[in-house]
Amino acid sequence: MARYLELNPQNYSDEEYDYDSYNPFPNFEKNLASHYGTDFVPRINLDDFFLDDEDFEFCDDPLNCCFPDYLASLGEEEFIYEGDEPYIVLKHQLVSSTMWDDGTFTYPILPPFKTSSISYFLPKPGEVLHRCLMAVAKGMDPDLQVAVGTEFQFRAESDSSHPPDITTEDQGTVVATGPQPSAPAMATLATAATGTMPEEWKNFFSYYTTINWATTDETGKVLFVQNLAPRMNPFLDHIAKMYTGWSGSMEVRFTISGSGVFGGKVAAVLVPPGISTEGGTNLLQFPHVLVDARQTEPVIFTIPDIRTQLWHDMHDTSTSHLVILVYNDLVNPFQGGENGTSCTITVETRGGTDFEFHLLKPPTRKMIFGADPSRLIPRRSQFWEGNRLPGVITSFVCLPRMFQANRHFDCKRQTFGWSRPVHKGIEVRVDATNKDAANTTDIGIHVVTARNAIKSDIPDGWPDYYRTGEQVYNNTTQTFQEVKESVMGSAVPDSTATAMTWHHLPTVVFGHGTAVGSKTTNSKVLSGNFYAIGNFDQSGNIKLYPSYWIAKEQSAGGAPIGAYEDMVKRIDVLPTAQTTGGNFPVAFVSKFASSHNGNGVSVYNSQILTTSALLAQDVYDIGPNALAVFKIKGSGGYWFDLGISADGFSYVGGGNLNFSSLQFPLEATYVGMASLHNKLQYNLGGSATTL
């Protein structure tokens, strides 16, 4: 981008001039600055423009850009050495400078600047950059000697005067329709009948919540905590969907039921932004007021908007808090017996006189608050592992319905499962007592209890797919031949207090529910006891590793794991995805070792394990009717679009795609956001599309 002058070496030779101690042209800077209407040329250290040495890795020559076509629209830079005569500067300026389209001269950006012994200036900065900088400079100092050929004009679309080439919202072709009879009169009657008035949602209190204050609540107990936000009011929360930001205070009205009967006081504390609301009576160190339970009239508090910026975005939680806590215990003189009584505090809210919304947006567009979904799928398929059971993803399958709770997370970090998004040993403690009391062999039904659970005392990592109903176990040390549709694994000692006396690592089968005789009854809901069926003659801590699937039929190793909803285990809710807008749920298929099939049984996974881990760690910005779309491309060139929805399930644009045409390894590329109701695209060999 830069153009270099043909310089005489003697003018800038370090052997002839030492610029730190000798200046051969003492009037050089003054003469140069005079061409630009300034008195001096400021000195700038280019190193100050970079944060650290790592920044230089991105550009090894910041003064000579690698993209001249792009920067040509912004401007051109030129520099000269101090050894050059001032007339060369003037000549170079006149040769380089040009005229704008309107005939005005292209004045250089003011002022030029110096680095070391080199002076830079911009004779042709580009019209947009030039005029923007001039407008900013002139706004800071009206007396600054700058030249602006054409001043910018900023206006709203609704301004009355506008250029003819701009269409405003009040322009357009009027379509003839039947006139509304007496429109002004009808509008007046409607206003009179409904009481509609401008911004009426600001003028009255709306119910927000209720607080229970009991005689058993001790001094310092926090009854109510609320940060300043539009969601405090139902109308503000509704209107907020159309705006990007807000500012202003809110008023909160408290009404205590039973006033005049109860005694006691509560304190209303205003906590500034950025300070924790924990601490009980310590909160009374902040500004506060006291409210007596005998107060018969409602009490109104104002939560002021204390902020360090001009306005808040809709996700801003660094706002003031209103805390209501017990100051004096509630007393009911008519209370009889030891049972406590309580009163109810009704909370109503409205916007303050200074409350306003800012920056209009369509209600259907979502604010970008969460993490970027572009990293939800690893780029290379070599790193794709299923979230149901260990195994690398080898294919995909379209399903009319997809269901999975365990290790399945949505974009808000929520799960209905009981396992962390990682495949590891299941940490339990086994009881040596055999529930099959009549058994005289070494195989028994043993209760295991979770040592590491995240929900409902279910062992973290417990399998979510095996037979529902009765399961009979063949009590022999040689085989589990009668066991069908079950997960088998191995057990290893873990942090035992005494030496283990096992002669070998036991093989176990997973079950839960109730155990009677040589069978267990497994329900769809994980409840009751959890069992490890195997050879245990000693209690202690163990780890269980699911590693094998006992199939039902001899042929093909049985149905895929995850295919039947009745066999999918859950705690209460089973997240389910179904066809939407022409897009079908897709399962990630991996393989798991199985009987009757040397290639293993297929496993339907709702997510890639890495996706589950990322969703568990952070909130992602995926709207309720949106998809984060990735292009999955095979080595042979075939591809299809895969979209991840807000509930964590994945979709593709057809119900019968030829995934067999894909050649592994695959590569995932983030495309962007799309509507859930727009059909996703694909280009797979042998696939046909019906319009």
Swiss-Prot record:
Alphabetic keyword roster: Capsid protein, Host cytoplasm, T=3 icosahedral capsid protein, Virion
Taxonomy, superkingdom: Viruses
InterPro entries linked: Calicivirus_coat (IPR004005), Rhv-like (IPR033703), Viral_coat (IPR029053)
Site feature (Cleavage) residues: E157, S158
Residue stretches in coiled coil: none
The UniProt record lists the keyword Transferase: no
GO CC aspect terms: host cell cytoplasm; T=3 icosahedral viral capsid
Family according to the record: Belongs to the caliciviridae capsid protein family.
Name the record gives this protein: Capsid protein VP1
Species this protein is from: Canine calicivirus (strain 48)
